[in-house]
């Protein structure tokens, strides 16, 4: 029999120290990685419940195990809330990640060798959109579209030309480092003209979409997937939304074709996050996320840095570091020393290797969760610029670290 009084610290002190180190890092470092956020205490609590003990292969009302009365309620809550949040018809909340949700979509609608038209990884796409190193680029005939070299926005003319030339079975829209509004209707029109499915991966934009600050692709695309962290601020996981005629194929693609038992504790945490995302406070939060990103981009431009495409419409943007004779890897290392966390990121047509890069990606979901507004975002952008101007100056790095820690202390992630 277990005692509820037993703690991780008592059972596994080595693991406890690692966890506490990460707790401290999250509290005293400013997080600017666009794909990261802080889950609420309620989301964390749901994910740490006894629901982790329950196997529930199948779907609510049709399980392969007994004892699923309560987990059926949990999963149905998540389903109903997700459906309402995005005005979806069919939803599946079981994918363990956004990438697995994408794999299930491909498995449900494509055959090996079918042509897939997705955004180039080098221009801001995602690995799972047909990159050669990913299974989506190995199993399917992957063709990539990209950005207009002048505007650094999606080149819809090229997209249409490629679609007519290659006649893809599926066109993928969505990105991992694209700061502008994506025209879902333009994608729909092109897909219809060549008889292709339209699949949207909205993982980065889901929270903004839920709040009404970014166009909703649900109902336009045949398939929509998302991760549940990032701007949606839930647990790490994935979801699928689609037109109802794809329900049977998608359910089968998730279980039993790509997954076994669903993670019921994670689905519970998703349900909490979906409820939080339907609140007025969440709408206000997403508005602030965009405002903070725009402030940071503007200040960095004023400090002599180039922002890819010149502007942002969402929670993130790319900074071109070539004018500073600095690589993304060098910038990432210097900023981390100064208690500011970013990720190195390729810019369009980047001459550097993927582990080096010529840019960094900056996102504001996490700092906005802390409570940063325009004033703090302006201060932070200037701190980032200070580091990028003197990445090896220890005095500058120490001063920026002190100011960053002061901001963190003023805006703790998890208060008392």
UniProtKB/Swiss-Prot annotation:
Which domain of life does the UniProt lineage start with?
Bacteria
The chain residues annotated with the modification N6-(pyridoxal phosphate)lysine are: 230
Task: Give the main EC class.
Answer: transferase
EC numbers, comma separated:
2.1.2.1
User: Which GO molecular function terms does the record list?
Assistant: glycine hydroxymethyltransferase activity; pyridoxal phosphate binding
SUPFAM superfamilies listed in its UniProt record:
PLP-dependent transferases
InterPro entries according to UniProt: PyrdxlP-dep_Trfase, PyrdxlP-dep_Trfase_major, PyrdxlP-dep_Trfase_small, Ser_HO-MeTrfase, Ser_HO-MeTrfase-like, Ser_HO-MeTrfase_PLP_BS, SHMT-like_dom
The GO cellular component terms are: cytosol
Q: Which reaction does it catalyse?
A: (6R)-5,10-methylene-5,6,7,8-tetrahydrofolate + glycine + H2O = (6S)-5,6,7,8-tetrahydrofolate + L-serine
Where does it reside? Cytoplasm
Which Gene3D superfamilies does the entry mention?
A: Aspartate Aminotransferase, domain 1, Type I PLP-dependent aspartate aminotransferase-like (Major domain)
Recite the UniProt keywords alphabetically: Amino-acid biosynthesis, Cytoplasm, One-carbon metabolism, Pyridoxal phosphate, Transferase
CDD domains recorded for this chain?
SHMT
Entry's NCBIfam families? PRK00011.1
Family membership noted in the UniProt record: Belongs to the SHMT family.
Q: Which HAMAP family match?
A: SHMT (MF_00051)
Q: What does this protein do?
A: Catalyzes the reversible interconversion of serine and glycine with tetrahydrofolate (THF) serving as the one-carbon carrier. This reaction serves as the major source of one-carbon groups required for the biosynthesis of purines, thymidylate, methionine, and other important biomolecules. Also exhibits THF-independent aldolase activity toward beta-hydroxyamino acids, producing glycine and aldehydes, via a retro-aldol mechanism.
Name of this protein = Serine hydroxymethyltransferase
């Amino acid at each position: 029999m277990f005692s509820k009084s037993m703690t991780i610290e008592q059972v596994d002190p080595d693991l406890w120290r690692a966890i506490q180190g990460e707790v401290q890092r999250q509290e005293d470092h400013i997080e600017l990685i666009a794909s990261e956020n802080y889950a609420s205490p309620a989301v964390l609590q749901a994910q740490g419940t006894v629901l982790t003990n329950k196997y529930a292969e199948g779907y609510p009302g049709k399980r392969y195990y007994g004892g699923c009365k309560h987990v059926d309620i949990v999963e149905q809550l998540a389903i109903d809330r997700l459906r309402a949040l995005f005005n979806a018809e069919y939803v599946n909340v079981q994918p363990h990640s956004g990438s697995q949700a994408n794999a299930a979509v491909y498995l449900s609608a494509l055959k090996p060798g079918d042509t897939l038209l997705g955004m180039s990884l080098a221009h801001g796409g995602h690995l799972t959109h047909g990159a050669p190193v990913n299974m989506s680029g190995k199993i399917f005939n992957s063709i990539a579209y990209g950005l207009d070299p002048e505007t650094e926005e999606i080149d819809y003319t090229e997209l249409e030309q490629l679609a007519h030339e290659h006649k893809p079975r599926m066109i993928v829209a969505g990105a991992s480092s694209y700061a502008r509004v994506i025209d879902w209707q333009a994608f729909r029109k092109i897909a219809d003209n060549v008889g292709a499915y339209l699949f949207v991966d909205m993982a980065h934009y889901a929270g903004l979409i839920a709040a009404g600050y970014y166009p909703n692709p649900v109902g336009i695309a045949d398939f929509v997937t998302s991760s549940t962290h990032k701007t949606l601020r839930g647990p790490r996981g994935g979801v699928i939304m689609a037109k109802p005629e794809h329900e049977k194929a998608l359910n089968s693609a998730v279980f039993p074709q790509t997954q076994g038992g669903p993670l019921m504790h994670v689905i519970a945490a998703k349900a909490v996050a979906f409820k939080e995302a339907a609140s007025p406070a969440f709408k206000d939060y997403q508005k602030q996320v965009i405002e903070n990103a725009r402030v940071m981009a503007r200040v960095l431009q004023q400090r002599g840095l180039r922002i890819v495409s010149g502007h942002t419409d969402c929670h993130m943007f790319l900074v071109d570091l070539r004018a500073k004779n600095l690589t993304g890897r060098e910038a990432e290392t210097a900023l981390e020393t100064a208690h500011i966390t970013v990720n190195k990121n390729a810019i369009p047509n980047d001459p550097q290797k993927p582990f080096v890069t010529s840019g960094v990606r900056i996102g504001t979901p996490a700092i906005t969760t802390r409570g940063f507004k325009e004033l703090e975002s302006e201060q932070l952008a200037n701190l980032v610029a200070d580091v990028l101007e003197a990445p090896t100056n220890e005095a500058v790095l120490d001063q920026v670290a002190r100011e960053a820690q002061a901001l963190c202390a003023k805006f703790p992630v998890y208060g008392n």
